[in-house]
């Protein structure tokens, strides 16, 4: 595979397969990204937890495989916490254990149950708990546990899915080993596929610390907005036992095709809530022609809740740490391997605004605002290969403001659009051809220019 599809700014393993992010946690100055990984091949299989660390969420260092599959079980998705109070007894108060909970998937009959492993050396080596599994319903579809410390009850809270039933189950524990069922949520919202990778967490509304809402993320496959994989969210109140949703309508985390299984970091300083997703879609993940690696993560995104037109919405924006990788300002026609395009678009004249980003071999994609349909869009028709897929992905702009903001992060093989304060997001993989690939941008003919625009080069990760 030629290097023009290398992930650059985005994390991928040096070799072999990667899908869901797992065990996201901040500890002792480092962000830990564990991930579903096949250590031996460039296809799904031999599921283990890979491991990478970063001090700034952008520049990652891959470490050896953390939790490996064995002869009896694969290590499916899960999460990690630091047991500061040593509730589990795995560590000490002076050296608390990092504890992972994961789905143990039995090879011979696909039985799934929740299991623990712990580390006393900051996630480098792990011991599987001898009392596993810690939660077993005798089911073949019961997975993806996400743990957190619930301050309202001073206990551990697990969010886990029953995929075929389209249900999220909540469990409580005092010691991480013994779990009691609290309640279930669902079916609700989008239910045309398996539910996976849930995540429940609190956020301030409009940065007001006196007003807290809880967000529940649920990935779904198939049944996503544009076919294949997608992620929906619900907002509501958590009373220590159950989530009471404000409504059960479908709200999409992302309007593109390539952001799935996203979950958030535990223990990020200053109560920030940061999400990373798998930048792919199960409809074509195995056919994406990269080697010796396959699988890329989205840029980390900070999540917030903001009120627009009386409705509370989940917003996602690139983490502020990305600013440290921004280079010189560029003009139309200038070239850079990776770009940030930040613009203010006017809606008052009733005219469209369209940007075109072109690779040096002639392939291109377009994004912008279509005035006729009142949508923010990405069109990758001319930046794709023969893999079957939809190409135009859009989000309807319903605001009445005369202008709105839009930011595009153009990677080596992707675009991530953040618009209207991050409430409308589109993530798409791209094929921008060219062995020595660079990109330039222009404002499409027949469209009005933006009110303002700033384009910067982004320093690649590697």
Language-model-derived ranges and their functions:
Residues 207-209, 235-462:
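Beta-rich accessory regions
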Residues 1-145, 149-195, 204-255, 279-329, ...:
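Beta-rich carbohydrate-recognition and catalytic domains
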